[in-house]
Amino acid sequence: MAFGDIRGTLQVAANSITNPTNPAGSVAVQVGDLVFVAVGEQTALTATGATSSFVTTYAATNAGLDAGTVTGRAFWGRVTSAGTLTQISVAATASGDNVSAVAVVFEGPFTSSPLDANPALVEDITSSFSAPASGTLAQADELIVTWAVNGVAGVWTATSPNVKRVELATQTVLTTKIGSWVVAATTTVTPAWTGTNPTDSVLGTNSFKKDLTTFNNKPQMFAVL
């Protein structure tokens, strides 16, 4: 595996959101990995934070966005101890609202403060759907993460170089998805998707910095001829 590769996913969909809402799975994690969580909720934006084993602190990318009939918010955390991650708890207000929450674990090493690009969330209801532009990146080696919540059960397709990593619908109400790819230049990027036009949507873009010091100091294997 290499920097930015997918270690695994956790997910949950329900017709009624609970407090907490718990994306579940089984993913082996290492120190320096990144966990990214996207929460899609019907009508109300109530997700306030995330917690789990092996991650000391999760942070919200921003305050989230209420697009009308669907809302979305994302959280991220850097893995601080190794183990098998089986659940993430997302604090939210219990109600009859539908919810779809998904998480992806990305292989590191990421810097201790990895978040770089964090533009404001946008809405787009006409395919192709453009997430916000990242802006010029702080360094060449970064992971681009894009996510979306769309008010329709239809499948969306990631537009290259974006690669869809997870997508989960709750009934026909909404679908939450995460895509990603690794870049090797500081040039701004604009992630995109195509698919069924939704009633409304929330789209986000973030980038996370590779720990170049840790990576470059790893022992290298050379063949003896």
Can you say where each PLM-predicted feature lies in the sequence?
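Primarily extracytoplasmic/secreted proteins
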Residues: M1-L225
